[in-house]
């Protein structure tokens, strides 16, 4: 995810904290470069809309939250987040440009990094008929 953020002007990344085991809790903001430059104004417009009856969304981008893999033993979501993030960072053409001009995506690649690591460890040590206890083989 850091590489995507470094390579694309559509993505910013921030560490929102860390898990019990010390893994980072990342949040990517994915949108057009134009929206990134106005992100504080967009945030304020959305906050103001919660305090009024203004339901007009035609003049501001919508905000979407995408979170992947809350259950550690279901790794496909976090694995898919890499591909989804890459598509949003690198795709070209009018369709992706229109999407990112009209949407701010708050992108959480793994709700549960500790559980994902626990499952990966389990899968790598228990997936074979012959258990391998040698720690450097994991």
Mark where each language-model region is.
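Surface-exposed loop and adjacent secondary-structure segments within mature catalytic domains
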Residues: 17, 28-32, 42-46, 51-54, ...
